[in-house]
Amino acid sequence: MESIWSKTCDIRKREPLRADIEADAVIIGGGMAGILIAYQLKQVGLHAVVLEAERIGGGQTKNTTAKITSQHGLFCKTFIEKKGKETALRYVQANQEAVEEYKRVIREEKIECEFQETDSYVYSRDEDKLKQEADAACEL
């Protein structure tokens, strides 16, 4: 199934890199995260190059529901078990900081994108897993 973004947005095709170039940083991937990093590096005066296999915004970003979120389903419990509470907390904080950074850039650059803050929900058919996830999230 083709996403609405594929149907309604004409992403300009870029020519492939054909020669060696110099840069302060190379970013692999031209999705939302890669472009945000490139923007941040430019803001501090660094020359960054974004390398994207297909088209900018054409991979995972294209297939989203146009959301920027720090909530990624049932992940806290498993993350804590695999990586520990401290690493899980840093991950959750970094995700929320990214959401705040997108909001800041949209506001400061006056980007017209109909950005809205809304509630986030996680659905599960397994009530026990949902409770365990809520407990794990509260630990963080």
Residue ranges and their predicted role:
Residues 1-25, 43:
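Extreme N-terminal leader/targeting segments of oxidoreductases
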Residues 41, 63-66, 136:
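Short, glycine/charged-enriched secondary-structure capping and boundary segments
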Residues 35, 57-58:
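Catalytic P-loop NTPase motifs of RecA-like helicase/translocase cores
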Residues 59, 63-94:
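Glycine-rich active-site loop/strand segments that organize a redox cofactor
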Residues 20-50:
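N-terminal Rossmann-like FAD-binding beta1-loop-alpha1 element of flavoenzymes
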Residues 82-140:
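Rossmann-like flavin
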